[in-house]
Regions:
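GT-A fold catalytic core of metal-dependent nucleotide-sugar glycosyltransferases
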Residues: 167-239
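Helix-loop boundary elements of multi-pass alpha-helical membrane proteins
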Residues: 2-26
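N-terminal anchoring/stem segment of glycosyltransferases
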Residues: 21-170, 179-188, 445, 449-465
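Catalytic core and acceptor-binding pocket of nucleotide-sugar-dependent glycosyltransferases
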Residues: 248-360, 367
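E2/UBC-UEV (E2-variant) core
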Residues: 229-261
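C-terminal catalytic/acceptor-binding lobe
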Residues: 320-466
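Short secondary-structure boundary/capping segments
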Residues: 108-110, 139-142, 207-218, 320-323, ...
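Short catalytic/ligand-binding loop motif for oxyanion handling, primarily in non-cytosolic enzymes
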Residues: 102, 132-134, 159-160, 200-204, ...
């Protein structure tokens, strides 16, 4: 099985703090000076809920039926792959290496996509795998529906010219490798959505913008909304990375006459302060991938920090004059951040914050949970770096589910002290904790149901992260 290892892993930095491997939140601006960045909260105008249809909000999510042990024993959808609406235009891709850490995250992407019956094709781009790792991964993925695929690439972590290593080189180079391969989309009007591997589906992703439930923040207005993603009109999630890249040596990075060098600070924030999911017409994504791969080593040369690849994407999009429609509703991640899908969560009544019933009761949800922060309420916690790599095995137990009234607790345990929460902070943290754990448990249960011999699967809820 994939990801053999200890049940629990509590791994931290020498200074006792867990590494964060994602942007510290929408509505934050990274300031150069520290290896992980110093972040200053920017006060942003409130989000706007677009007055449009709620098509698809009634979607039934099979994994969310998990409520007891053994879970969902009588739910047929937990013992077979679900059928999803066909869409030969839509491709969702995400970049990983072949570590156990990213193996379990990848499986979580596929199983939660299956749970919401995500249309289209989903592709894991796996870079730097050994031949043995490729064989092991492919053997498992051969049991998946044809709409779930893996594409292997060389390891791009070291830049051939500079000799410098950067984990996230794999992201643009891997995307370009896939787009140049025989596995690339065949439809001339295909839409490609680039995700992160630490995404869990709460509802299906669609490229039909106005048929979705949309959130956006000023300066974006209702007049900026488009019917759907099309050539020349990409869409992405708002990230608070701001306009810092305009202060880089843009002419060195993108060329003397690059349009990127002429982008104003306000336009950089409005059109290019974005992150995953990036959603674009395949022709646009090909051009972006090429420029992104060309620019990222030069950006990293000037800015050798975590966000280099995101800034390189912004410069590539600006260079190609492909302004992005910046939307807020695609994901939630940082409980204190503006510009995410939190208005959906803030409007939930208490009974639905930690309840699996929310989607079935017409409660609005973000598309993804982006679980890249440390979430804590009371004595409950979750961080992806503390998840054992053997989560998706027959032997591994499941997570203990937090109580459904967790949002009523307005404090968190920091070890040596308690930190008080506002009601909103408690509700957001509880939402992330309950739903990430429920989603991962449901995914692990379905993995066991599909892959383990009768009587050999461990359904006990024993894992608790703090």
């Amino acid at each position: 099985m994939l990801g053999t290892g200890a049940r629990m892993r509590k791994k931290s930095n020498p200074n006792g703090k867990i590494k964060t491997t994602c942007t510290r939140g929408l509505g934050f601006v990274a300031i150069v000076g520290f290896s992980w960045g110093l972040f200053i909260l920017t006060r942003l105008a409130g989000p706007v809920l677009a007055p449009i249809s709620r098509e698809g909000s009634e979607n039934r999510n099979a994994l969310d039926t998990l409520a007891s042990v053994p879970p969902a024993k009588n739910d047929p959808s937990m013992w077979q792959w679900n059928e999803a609406p066909e869409d030969d235009r839509l491709y969702l891709v995400f970049s990983t290496d072949c570590s156990g850490y990213q193996n379990w995250q990848s499986l979580a992407v596929f199983f939660t996509a299956d749970a919401v019956r995500q249309p289209g094709t989903i592709v894991r781009i796996a870079s730097g795998c050994s031949e043995a790792e490729k064989k092991e991964v492919q053997k498992l993925y051969d049991t998946f529906p044809v709409r779930f695929q893996v594409h292997f690439t060389p390891n791009f972590k070291k830049d051939a010219k500079s000799g410098k290593s950067y984990d996230f080189y794999n992201k643009p180079y891997g995307l370009q490798h896939w787009l140049d391969s025989k596995a690339a989309p065949k439809h001339k009007d295909a839409i490609v959505a680039l995700l992160d591997p630490d995404f869990l589906f709460m509802r299906p992703l669609t490229y039909k913008v106005k048929q979705d439930r949309v959130l956006y923040s000023p300066p974006v207005t209702d007049g900026d909304l488009i019917d759907e993603v099309r050539e020349g009109h990409p869409v992405a999630q708002y990230y608070g990375i701001g306009s810092q890249w305009t202060k880089f040596k843009v002419e060195y990075i993108a060329g003397k006459d690059s349009p990127a060098s002429k982008v104003s600070i306000s336009d950089a924030s409005r059109y290019y302060s974005v992150g995953a999911p990036y959603i674009a017409h395949v022709k646009d994504m090909r051009k972006i991938a090429e420029s992104w791969a060309n620019f990222v080593p030069r950006v990293y040369e000037e800015y050798p920090h975590l966000l280099a690849e995101m800034y390189a994407y912004s410069i590539a999009a600006a260079h190609l004059e492909l302004p992005h429609l910046r939307l807020d509703h695609y994901m939630v991640s940082n409980t204190q951040a503006a510009g995410e899908g939190w208005p959906f969560v803030d409007r939930l009544t208490d009974k639905y914050v930690c309840s699996a019933e929310a989607p079935d009761q017409g409660q609005e949800q973000p598309v993804f949970l982006h679980y890249c922060q440390f979430y804590r309420v009371e004595h409950w916690g979750f961080h992806k770096r503390r998840v054992a790599t053997n989560l998706f095995t027959c032997e591994s137990p499941l997570f203990i589910m937090p109580p459904e009234d967790l949002e009523d607790t307005h404090w968190k345990d920091n070890g040596d002290k308690k930190t008080m929460y506002s009601k909103q902070e408690a509700q957001r943290a509880a939402y992330m904790l309950c739903n990430v754990i429920r989603k991962l448990n449901g995914a692990a249960v379905k993995f066991k149901n599909l892959n383990c011999l009768a009587g050999s699967a461990n359904y006990t809820q024993e894992i608790k992260i703090w």
